């Protein structure tokens, strides 16, 4: 299975490099790279794990677009391996392989898995937590509880959204028919204590920054309109159902293409009820399957219901990490007949889809920018802007460009694409990443940037007047050309504020 996951990650890295060749990397990826430039216990909006991993990754690999796609696919490859281990706790190897290939066909694990960020990293840490729970539930030992607590802490260090999954696991432990055995053992209580102790350093950081992530969440995702919340919830449900429909439909196709002769043999075998029941018990661990079913149902229903109750802005991307158990929940249905031929079929479907996409990806990239040059934010040539501003800074001061003051959409790509990797200073946001400050920016000098197309242009220019009164204004226009097709021409208003000395 490690070989399959590695092949999937390698092939889809090649695909994404070609599919995204006409674009700069997503701002979320650049943000994670920026976090990784400085080790902290948190980064304003989120816990630190995504930044730590990005920092480690780019100490090994070059700061290049392809390395970001490789990071995303390496993350998903690890997720596939962990989901394989989860599946083996519930079903036999045949069904477990079917589950993993279904996940590889799930768009989150291929097309939509192009941007490394805390949402994507949850597809490693949440499966690890589920695996630890499925290990602790039957063992009920101190050591299994310790691993469960550490896995929970690791997940919480990825994104606070994982509380959704932690709550689902807690409910599974309370609802499961064998709950008395588990709750009467040391495992769950050791897990709770371990998680609490492991989170102490981060909790201290939260107090030091006055719980700024909660300020961020309340400011950005709290809504006043219940009707608008309901609209977002419907969009979230529809979006994630469509994504799940892809692997489910392809799995159904793989099952339907089993020859009639093999299906008839299965029907004849099922006439021997006692043998049939024994076979069911051999391939599905019903006790563990119940855990999986409960967890998946709770997170599937809990997120939209919670958003409706608390009027929260429910982003479609928040479903990225919540449905990796769906293929297993379906394949673990004991009455499902899974022939060896179905494994060949679904593996063949994966191979055909992957190879066809690999061949077509250069043409898809060229066609997309030709048909809709304003269709993606990444078509704006921020990488060229970063290079030109770096040259402008060096020509004036002959020092490293240390700070960029801009919105996330503009500033984070500067951090990634400039060889100086300046830290981004947020403009009038109370949830600073902590990577720099206005005092440090004024001491070291900075470049402020306003996008002339942004609705917030007046606010950006007002900030520059207030904080960069002595800055040199500079106007730069960038435009990307990809295989003869032009992207949007963007005018950027830059402000070069010199160092204090």
Please report, for each region that a protein language model flagged, where it lies by residue.
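Membrane-interface transmembrane helices that cradle and orient dolichyl/undecaprenyl
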Residues: 88-89, 93-94, 129-147, 334
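Membrane-proximal, lumen/periplasm-facing interface regions of secretory-pathway glyco-
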Residues: 22, 312-316, 340-399, 408-423, ...
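Hydrophobic/aromatic-rich transmembrane helices and adjacent perimembrane loops
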Residues: 39, 290, 294, 310-346
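Loop-to-helix entry region of an early transmembrane alpha helix in multi-pass inner-membrane enzymes
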Residues: 48-52, 61-81, 112-116
